[in-house]
UniProtKB/Swiss-Prot annotation:
Helicase ATP-binding domain span: 72-270
Protein name, entry field: Putative pre-mRNA-splicing factor ATP-dependent RNA helicase DHX32
Any single GO CC term annotated in Swiss-Prot or TrEMBL for this entry: mitochondrion
Catalyses which reaction(s): ATP + H2O = ADP + phosphate + H(+)
Species the sequence originates in: Mus musculus (Mouse)
Broad enzyme group: hydrolase
Similarity-based family: Belongs to the DEAD box helicase family. DEAH subfamily.
Origin: domain of life: Eukaryota
């Protein structure tokens, strides 16, 4: 997204493009004067406040404002318009408002406006800002929809949403008939959901000639997008200030040392302005944070305070905004240093940034379909990302970009464009969605960048193993219900299985806790022992999934027994737990429970703590995660994946790592190939239980290994009726599916 617009709040009454629909005067001179004294807001019929005019002056200073007339002309005459502009030009806040004016001028006969964002933080903050600029109420005329939170009504004119939420809406409303204008923002981020929408909307536009599509992107992607939609018109917005770029003259030796040195050189120089540092990964953020805080504590007070802000995009509250004016008046000068990664490029919304330090590298998650695991790959950023980081300084006449790489590296080693997530991600959820919206022939869907055939085949294979597909390759009844949950298909399958195994309550808690950000806080140096002591009180001998239930239940007990929210926050702080993550888990769980009730799935009363309940939870987990099993091959915690020859260790925060008791077989929620190869969220399972639940056609396809032989021997010790029942359950025959699926 792109916001100098969020820093600016002042000019003459706005000259609207559709005066005939917005004018409230008779036309006589006296009436016009009266109308100007009390101009009415056409969106709610109330007089404009003084703040509206103050913000209007700021809007008119945005680079995009001078393109309003040409944009409105293009909108009237074309079905698709591409808006190309730098990340501080104002397109994310102004274009949706102009589209709302267009919809108002035609009396909303084709619907309202929806604008997608790649990040939920930007969707929320843009909605708040635009509601303020339009002088209307947030949640009424302007609202937002993000995962597990809907701040809209049926009367909402302009909605901001995350791209995945608009994608999910297509399951129930494939042609998006509620909207007259759809705006895809931040397309240059190439998120999976945005790329899917780009492809699907081509068909929607053919079916709905009255629908308008606006595509906002950075300049480097403009020509590709214009030709993708058939040489559509492009509105180009230029920023006004040049930026000084400083490259390294020689090879990079130590990026951490260079970053730390630059931060303090800038601070001691006396030049005003905040600093943004782009690092490769979150671990680098933590390391840099500690080093800067440690060295900053020894600064001379005369140079001013240095406030270090780690910006983690996964956290809901992470957003870097301008300092409030009242805050400025109450404090001495402070220079803020924001530490972030490439994921934070869209989250910097402050015109006070005067310096950007760019290491030129990022650690990306790249999915390997052959081993069904993500690899963390350190690689150069793209030229388009480097340009976006430069654009953060576009509003500053004296901004400086320090590139900790050579100019030759930028031209030869950096790719022109950021890789599409579709070419690097696990596509199982996407394929489930495409099947749900009944897109015939995935290979023929017109994606801007086609996904790898191997990734598509692996996704289809996994859905088949999960019983989400029938014999014809269409969605089974299981698959249709799985697609109702905004979760990974494996997690959705585990929830469905829990309906049969009478442990829905516990499974919903597990699903919410693994979907929300980690509830365990990053522990500062020196406090590790105290944190582990606190966390030991939550440990469960059956594994990490059960430990998460203990944490959630303890949080719920604290909420019920606390006098106020502050007491809950203090409890979380004392236990080294993230209060915001636990609140998010609570919200997610409530929505999942609502889905269970809406589609009338059976819901058993909680029975957590009993031996039978523990076994049932593991059965439900195995029903979805039978492809994520590992065995300790040497008794020392070296776990070999069942599906391939990768060796991993349990994460240090695992209950087994803390108690030093390593089970032989574990089911795990997450594994990434990286320096440490950690398995995250693991629980012990037995070979016998695994063989009861695993689909036989999946097991037969496993490569030969010692682990497979051990499992085969375990199956030989099972009662014959158990094995036969399992084969019936896991067979792809529709009749067998109906026998097991008591929820149908």
């Amino acid at each position: 997204m792109d916001e100098e617009e969020l820093d600016h709040p002042n000019a003459s009454p706005e000259k609207r493009y559709f005066p005939e629909s917005l004018d409230s005067s008779d036309g006589d001179e006296e009436g016009v004067l009266a109308c100007e004294d009390l101009e009415l807001n056409p969106f709610d019929g109330l007089p404009y406040s003084s703040r509206y005019y103050k913000l209007l002056k700021e809007r008119e200073e945005l680079p995009i404002w001078k393109e309003k007339y040409s944009f409105m002309e293009s909108l009237l005459q074309n079905q698709v318009v591409v808006v190309s502009g730098d990340s501080k030009c104002g397109k994310s806040s102004q274009v949706p408002q102009w589209c709302a004016e267009y919809c108002l001028s035609i009396h909303y006969q084709h619907g309202g406006v929806i604008c997608t964002q790649a990040h939920k933080q930007t969707a929320v903050q843009l909605a708040l800002r635009v509601a303020d600029e339009m002088d209307v109420n947030i949640g009424h005329e302007v609202g937002y929809v993000i995962p597990f939170e809907n701040c809209c009504t049926t009367e909402t004119i302009l909605r901001y949403c995350t791209d995945d939420m608009l994608q999910r809406e297509m399951m129930s409303n494939p042609f998006l008939g509620s909207y007259g204008v759809i705006i895809l923002d931040d397309v240059h981020e190439r998120s999976l959901a945005t790329d899917v929408l780009l492809g699907l909307l081509k068909d929607v536009l053919l079916a709905r000639p009255e629908l308008k599509l606006i595509v906002n992107c950075s300049p480097l992607l403009t020509s590709k997008l214009s030709s993708y939609y058939g040489d559509v018109p492009v509105i180009e917005v230029r920023n006004k200030h040049p930026v000084e770029v400083v490259y390294l003259s020689g090879a990079q030796k130590d990026s951490f040392e260079s970053v730390i040195r630059l931060i303090f050189e800038i601070h001691r120089s006396g030049e005003k302005g905040d600093v943004v540092v782009f690092l490769a990964c979150e671990q680098d953020i933590e390391k840099t944070y500690e080093l800067v805080c440690q060295e900053g504590s020894n600064l001379n007070p005369d140079v001013g305070d240095l406030v270090v802000i780690p910006l983690y995009p996964k956290e809901k509250c992470s957003l870097f905004r301008p300092v409030d004016e009242t805050e400025k008046r109450c404090q001495v000068y402070q220079r803020r240093v924001v530490l972030t990664t490439s994921c934070g490029e869209s989250l910097i919304w402050s015109h006070t940034v005067k310096f950007v330090i760019d290491v030129g590298l990022e650690r990306r998650q790249v999915y390997n379909p052959r081993i069904r695991a993500n690899s963390l790959v350190l690689q150069p950023i793209s030229q388009s990302q480097a340009e976006i980081r430069k654009q953060l300084l576009g509003s500053s006449p004296s901004g400086k970009l320090f590139c900790l790489y050579t100019e030759e590296f930028a031209s030869k080693d950096m790719r022109p464009l950021k890789p599409a997530e579709m070419q690097e991600a696990n596509l199982t959820s996407m394929v489930l969605f495409m099947k749900r919206v009944d897109i015939a022939g995935l290979g023929r869907c017109d994606f801007m960048n086609r996904p790898a055939p191997e990734s598509l085949m692996q996704a289809l294979e996994d859905l088949d193993y999960l019983a989400a597909l029938d014999n014809d390759g269409n969605l089974s009844e299981f698959g249709i219900i799985m697609s109702e949950f905004p979760l990974d298909p494996q997690l959705s399958k585990s929830i469905l299985a829990s309906c049969e195994f009478d442990c829905v309550d516990e499974m919903l808690t597990i699903a919410a806790m693994v979907t929300a950000p980690s509830c365990f806080l990053h522990v500062p140096h020196g406090a590790e022992e105290a944190a582990v002591t606190c966390w030991k009180t939550f440990l469960h001998p059956e594994g990490d999934h059960f430990t998460l239930i203990n944490v959630y239940n303890a949080y719920q007990d604290t909420v019920l027994n606390s006098a106020n929210e502050h007491c809950v926050e203090m409890w979380c702080h004392d236990c080294f737990l993230s209060c915001s993550a636990l609140r998010m888990a609570d919200v997610i769980r409530a929505e999942l429970l609502e889905i269970i009730k809406r589609i009338e799935l059976p819901y058993a009363e909680p029975a957590f703590g009993s031996k039978e309940n523990g076994l049932n939870i593991k059965k439900a987990l195995l029903s979805g995660y039978f492809m994520q099993i590992a065995r300790d091959v040497d008794g020392s915690g070296n776990y070999l994946m069942l599906t391939h020859k990768q060796v991993a260790q349990l994460h240090p925060l695992s209950s087994y790592s803390i108690t030093k008791k390593m089970p032989e077989w574990v089911l795990f929620h997450q594994f990434s190939i990286s320096e440490n190869n950690y398995i995250r969220v693991a629980s012990a399972v037995s070979p016998e239980l695994f063989m009861q639940l695993v689909p036989q056609y999946y097991f037969s396809n496993l490569p030969p290994s010692e682990s497979k032989d051990i499992l085969q021997q375990a199956a030989g010790h099972l009662p014959t009726e158990t094995v036969n029942k399992d084969q019936d359950v896991c067979d792809k025959c529709p009749d067998a599916t109906e026998q097991r699926c008591t929820i149908q």
